Swiss-Prot record:
Renumbered residue ranges of the record's region Hydrophobic: 404-424, 432-452
Domain notes for this protein: The N-terminus binds RNA. It is necessary for encapsidation of VP1 and VP3. The N-termini of 10 VP2 molecules form a cylindrical hub underneath each 5-fold axis of the inner capsid.
Family indicated by similarity: Belongs to the rotavirus VP2 family.
Composition bias type Basic and acidic residues, residue spans: 19-30
Domain of life: Viruses
Species of origin: Rotavirus A (strain RVA/Human/United States/D/1974/G1P1A[8]) (RV-A)
Record note on quaternary structure: Homodecamer; each decamer is made up of two conformers of VP2, called VP2A and VP2B. Interacts with a VP1-VP3 complex. Interacts with the intermediate capsid protein VP6. Interacts with NSP5. Interacts (via N-terminus) with NSP2.
Post-translational modification: Sumoylated with SUMO1 and SUMO2. Sumoylation of viral proteins seems to have a positive role on viral replication.
Protein name: Inner capsid protein VP2
Presence of the UniProt keyword RNA-binding in the record: yes
Gene Ontology MF terms: RNA binding
Function: Inner capsid protein that self-assembles to form an icosahedral capsid with a T=2 symmetry, which consists of 120 copies of VP2, with channels at each of its five-fold vertices. This capsid constitutes the innermost concentric layer of the viral mature particle. It encapsidates the polymerase VP1, the capping enzyme VP3 and the genomic dsRNA, thereby defining the core.
Length: 890
């Protein structure tokens, strides 16, 4: 849009555009705009008014310039005259079209916020089935002559048989099994939830889970099952002891599975929940805050339970030497904090229009001839004020480093920056940005006021410009303010076991603003001896605008401090302060907006917002510690299983992925390995260590139940006769290695020394190679005869390749199509190899029936704050820590 200065000559006044650019850029732009105006002079004079008036257009790209009239009609000319006819309309033009600048606001990263809020206590670990590795399976029985009987026998086999071949790979399989158990390990087991009806029961009894019921059905229907076992199954039912809140359920489990589930039952994480626990769960500062009225539901059932969150502090010290990881954590904390900092809505702020009118009157804008003073009003809007308020508090809560964006020629921004540096500790700003801002304030306002020469600051100087100026300035009030600002640091205080970064008491109660105002008034009274009068007047007017709002600035400082400290009570991780890799940008024009538009309305977080913020922090912190425990356990297990090829980096990557917020591929390798080293130093949590020891003690039993691998192979120079085996018939299987010289297959492959094997075979001594090998079955007699000469011995001696070894199970029994070729027993089948395969554990019903005990019933509550109803006092009555209203200026 356009506005006019009455009585001004169009030819004499320069075009004033691009007010926020540096002077060099401004000159180029002014020349361009003047040329454009000269081309349009004649057209405008014809189409608008005959009087000589200046038309100044705003150069913003995103605003359509109403002053650019393209062959407009007479009605459009009338509308333009109406807009310009009153002073009020004229000021609205200034506010909305010319002097208003859109400040880029923070774009909330919803995906990160959602990831944080989606981290919940592990409800998925509420099991509906018992943990099982084994299941019983029926296998046929073979007679002495190799014919299959009609009878079957039950053996324990793996539910999911995915064992690889090779000793190293098998150990890696056990590591993956351990990892899977850690993921599935339940925090609590309530057998009543998983119990199902026993179909064979006489009195509608229940067994512990559906798999137990299926096993009972299969055994009950098996013709080989004894009558006493059937009667026992018919009597299987739960036993309830209501007075003790206990129930026993019958279960069918392999002894190893029973050991796991018994351990889970005896080491549950649930604890009794009562009102005292809920009371202590609420942060103490929220409980004691008179602005919040909390009421607790006292009707907790006696069966209420909860899982205590794991809130250990600083186990990995990610703030120390993990720049990339720490930056991600602080970024996600910043996004979360911004979502909970209350908004300064337009109704809580002074009307932007009214405030700009008042500022225009204070500045006497009608008489302005200096371009810099028009910038005082640039960028003042409620959106920028709200953005600044949220940025300051969220950055302090998350300890995110801020960088300042400002224009040196905008004195109002620099004066607002003096308030900012007074209130916000220096640590919060990027060092380079802080130095640039301080240097601009010193060279634009402070030194010119006293007639001192410009400060020439050396890059890399350990002192900041304010620290240098403090030593050189003689004026007590200004030096006193500089001293406070230079020493404005967070005080580290441990509250409720959490390291908090607290503000200086003078900032919390707002008294420091009086110190700032004394310094500003001293500066405005100085003569600026080396500067023109207009320069001095501009600075004085800027200071006047800020000093007119002394009361509001005190209130603003108290409001920022109160909101910060109240939300800080909900932070559960230590607030470690380290400069972050990336920074949050803060424009000083938005600080001006906040200073100028803050009203007398108190804005404090709602209790629901506080509870939400607290819950999200607790859930993330607890999940963080649990995932650390998992990673430490996996690293320890990999070392104890001698997984020398295992890449520890992959374990660390899995750990970071499970924390949800990290973009793992972007994390530098050096930080990955440093993280690995820190994880190695931590002790393994007790439950996880016990579970690993259970696996370690039973590895052989688990291997034995697999159909995929054999435990070794016996090779000989002369043929060995096939023997009868009850599970397979006539086969080349050895069930023990008694009498054989044994060599570890993994060691053999690592060393490559086959001389010992060759010598033993040539001396006609069979040798047993012990290790996990693929268990391949072949039942054809024809193929057996064909392979008599293709012995493993030939491969060992000639090819020197043990990894090609695939022992074959030669089946000669009634299942074979060729069985009747050898039924006369005149020909005795032989083989130069024997497969060493351990016998799986037979299924014994009596040994597999276990009674499991758990609570009859309890209810686990994940959100303890749901029992608390909360409200706030009237915001206008809200008081700060000093028992005075937060906002005193009414």
């Amino acid at each position: 849009m356009a506005y006019r200065k009455r009585g001004a000559k169009r030819e004499n006044l320069p075009q004033q555009n691009e007010r926020l650019q540096e002077k060099e850029i401004e000159k180029d732009v002014d020349v361009t705009m003047e040329n454009k105006n000269n081309n349009r002079k004649q057209q405008l004079s014809d189409k608008v008014l005959s009087q000589k008036e200046e038309i100044i257009t705003d150069a913003q790209d995103d605003i359509k310039i109403a002053g650019e009239i393209k062959k407009s009609s007479k009605e459009e000319s009338k509308q333009l005259l109406e807009i310009l006819k009153t002073k009020e309309d004229h000021q609205k033009e200034i506010q909305y079209e010319i002097l208003q600048k859109t400040i880029p606001t923070f774009e909330s990263k919803e995906s990160i916020l959602k990831k944080l809020e989606d981290i919940r206590p592990e409800q998925a670990k509420k099991q509906m089935k018992l943990f099982r590795i084994f299941e019983p399976k029926q296998l046929p029985i073979y007679r002495a002559n190799g014919e299959k009987e009609l009878r079957n026998r039950w053996y324990w086999k793996l539910k999911k048989d995915t064992l690889p071949d090779g000793d190293y790979d098998v150990r890696e399989y056990f590591l993956n099994l351990y990892d899977q158990i850690l993921i599935e390990m339940p925090d609590y087991l309530l057998l009543k939830d998983m119990a199902v009806e026993n179909k064979n029961s006489r009195d509608a009894g229940k067994v512990v889970d559906s798999e137990t019921a299926n096993i009972c059905d299969a055994i009950f229907q098996d013709e080989e099952t004894e009558g006493v076992v059937r009667r026992f199954i018919a009597d299987m039912r739960q036993q309830v002891q209501a007075d003790r809140n206990i129930v026993n359920y019958p279960s069918i489990l392999h002894p190893i599975d029973h050991a796991f589930n018994e351990y889970f039952l005896n080491h549950q994480l649930v604890e009794p929940l009562n009102n005292e626990i809920i009371f202590n769960y609420i942060p103490e500062r929220i409980r004691n805050d008179v602005n919040y009225i909390l009421n607790m539901d006292m009707n907790l059932p006696s069966t209420a339970r909860y899982i205590r969150p794991n809130l250990l502090q600083d186990r990995l010290n990610l703030h120390d030497n993990f720049e990339s990881l720490w930056d991600t954590i602080t970024t996600s904390n910043y996004i979360l904090a911004r979502s909970v900092v209350p908004d300064l809505k337009e109704k809580e702020l002074v009307s932007t229009e009214a405030q700009i009118q008042k500022m225009s009157q204070d500045l006497q804008l009608e008489a302005l001839t200096i371009q810099s003073e028009t910038q005082f009003l640039a960028g003042i809007n409620s959106q920028a004020a709200n953005d600044c308020f949220k940025t300051l508090i969220a950055a302090m809560l998350s300890q995110r480093t801020m960088s300042l964006d400002f224009v040196t020629t905008n004195y109002m921004s620099l004066i607002s920056g003096m308030w900012l540096l007074t209130v916000i500790p220096n640590d919060m700003f990027l060092r380079e940005s802080l130095v640039a801002c301080e240097l601009a304030i010193i060279n634009t306002i402070v030194y010119p006021a006293f007639g001192m020469q410009r400060m020439h600051y050396r890059n890399g100087d350990p002192q900041t410009p304010f620290q240098i100026a403090e030593q050189q300035i003689q004026n007590f009030q200004v030096a006193n303010w500089l001293h406070f600002t230079n020493n404005n640091r967070f005080r580290q205080v441990v509250i409720d076991g959490v390291l908090n970064q607290t503000l200086n008491d003078n900032i919390r109660n707002g008294q420091v603003i009086n110190q700032l105002m004394e310094a500003l008034m001293q500066l405005s009274r100085q003569q600026f001896p080396t500067m023109p009068v207009d320069y001095k007047r501009s600075i004085q007017r800027g200071i006047l605008l800020l000093s007119n709002r002394l009361g509001q600035l005190v209130d603003l400082t108290r409001l920022v401090s109160y909101n910060y400290e109240t939300l800080m009570a909900c932070v559960t991780m230590n607030m470690q302060h380290v400069q972050t890799l990336t920074t949050e940008k803060l424009q000083l024009t938005s600080v001006t907006s906040l200073c100028m538009l803050i009203g007398n309305t108190t804005v404090i977080p709602s209790p629901q917002t506080l509870f939400h913020y607290y819950n999200v922090n607790v859930n993330f912190h607890s999940n963080y510690n649990e995932r650390i425990n998992d990673a430490v356990a996996i690293i320890t297990a990999a070392n104890r299983l001698n997984l020398y090829q295992k890449k520890m980096k992959s374990i660390v990557e899995d750990f970071l992925k499970r924390l949800q917020i990290f973009d793992v591929p972007r994390v530098p390798d050096d930080q990955m390995y440093r993280l690995r080293d820190r994880l190695r130093l931590l002790p393994v949590e007790r439950r996880r260590l016990d579970i690993f020891n259970l696996i370690l003690m039973n590895m052989e039993q688990i291997e034995r139940a697999s159909d995929k691998i054999a435990q070794g192979v016996i090779i000989a120079y002369r043929d060995m006769q096939l023997e009868r085996d009850e599970m397979y018939g006539y086969v080349n299987i050895a069930r023990n290695l008694d009498g054989y010289q044994q060599i570890n297959l993994e060691e053999l492959m690592r060393t490559g020394d086959y001389g010992q094997i060759t010598n033993m075979l040539l001396n006609n001594q069979p040798v047993a190679l012990v290790g996990a090998l693929p268990f391949v079955t072949d039942s054809s007699v024809i193929s057996l005869i064909a392979k008599l000469d293709a012995t493993v011995f030939a491969q060992i001696v000639k090819l020197r390749k043990v990894d090609t070894l695939k022992p074959i199970l030669y089946k000669i029994n009634s299942d074979s199509n060729d069985f009747y070729l050898v039924a006369n027993y005149d020909w005795i089948p032989t083989s130069t190899t024997k497969v060493y395969k351990q016998v799986p554990q037979p299924f014994d019903f009596r040994a597999s029936m276990h009674m499991l005990t758990s609570n009859l019933t309890f209810t686990v509550y994940s959100d303890l704050l749901s029992f608390v109803s909360a409200d706030t006092v009237e915001p206008i009555n809200a008081v700060a820590f000093d028992n005075m209203r937060i906002m005193n200026e009414l």
